Amino acid sequence: MIAYENIEFFICLVNVLGNNMYNILFFIFLSIAIPFLLFLAWKQHLKTKEIRSYLLKEGYNIIFNGEGNSYLAFNISNATFRAGNLTSNDYFQASISYIHDYRWEWKEVEAKKINNIFIIYISNIDFPSQKLFYRNNKSLAEIDWAKLQAIFHQPYEIQNDVMQDNNNTHYDFFISHAKEDKDTFVRPLVDELNRLGVIIWYDEQTLEVGDSLRRNIDLGLRKANYGIVILSHNFLNKKWTQYELDSLINRAVYDDNKIILPIWHNINAQEVSKYSHYLADKMALQTSLYSVKEIARELAEIAYRRR
């Protein structure tokens, strides 16, 4: 009987000590974790304050807070923006012209806008967009939306020079193609390149009524960094495309950069070689192997590196 009572006492003692030990360990954990988390929060606050001060010092006076600690800041005086993180010194900087679209999305419940999101599209493959979240704060979203619109619409002199001076427009690509290929490939490619913010000389969106076709094509050829040549059976049978190709080849002879970027559209190497050994020797993207989006992405990366 005594032995049984001793066992019961021992079990109770273990339970009491076990519970106390758990409480002690939990208290020790909290006493370490809470100060550590407070320290990290304070350190993050100081870093955020430091980066904000630096942005203001650099002239980026309009700052939008994004998802997490991300930000989008604008320097109106030189028409540039920065996108980065308030807890890191890394950022992407470019001309405002690199932002090629923006929109406001929200869900509406009982006539109230909730989950407000601004999406800003940037012409950079590694940094394609920035999202600004406002949740249920409709008033703040409306104020910032007005600010965002003002950035792109106010007629200050420098932004006009960067974004609206058509006489000084420099193109990433001149697209040489046969009109018969517009619907099947060219127009979808141009739409995708436009979405990525690439600046293109393309007859449908560059020429206006009354323009001289020959003079404008010559201007586009001179002002483009690259010529995209969409080789197809239709292309090979055209005289006008031959004129454009000759102009591009003449430029390529005197330029160290790869001026001509061929795309083979429903055509093979043997057929290209019969038309031009020069083009047949060049690395080409083929529509039989890649989708329009994949081809546009490859071309956009080339354009961004050259800028």
Curated annotation (Swiss-Prot):
It is found in: Secreted; Membrane. Its EC number is 3.2.2.6, 3.2.2.-. Keywords: Hydrolase, Membrane, NAD, Secreted, Transmembrane, Transmembrane helix, Virulence. GO terms for cellular component: extracellular region; membrane. It is a single-pass membrane protein. The chain crosses the membrane at residues 22-42. This is NAD(+) hydrolase TcpC.
